[in-house]
Amino acid sequence: MLVVTTENIPGKKYEVLGEVFGVTTQSKNFVRNIGAGLKNIVGGEIKDYTKMLHEARMVAIERMKQEATEKGADAIVMMRFDSGSILQDMQSVVAYGTAVKFIED
């Protein structure tokens, strides 16, 4: 499944099938919270959180692709991410875009 952040795919014509999205919510565990608290004191990147957010994005993309496949799409255009905190220890990530089907010339 081709996924692009642009509106057009050079050399391709397509019909729009509709919006697709994938979402995941991940929680921070106790050990990560302790490590993050220490990093907050001394400064620097909190690698466990960075890894968690990267993994969450990958899960959201895969779920979005699955929804597009179920709609019969060949690609997703205008893909974007959104994320936010839920309560204090949870992070939600959504990947969304427009599912399209290629038109043969």
UniProtKB/Swiss-Prot annotation:
Signal peptide: none annotated. InterPro entries: UPF0145_dom_sf, UPF0145_YbjQ-like. Transmembrane segments: none annotated. It comes from the Bacteria. Gene3D superfamilies: Hypothetical protein apc22750. Chain B. Belongs to the UPF0145 family. HAMAP family: UPF0145. This is UPF0145 protein LSL_1614. It comes from Ligilactobacillus salivarius (strain UCC118) (Lactobacillus salivarius). The lineage of its organism: Bacteria, Bacillati, Bacillota, Bacilli, Lactobacillales.
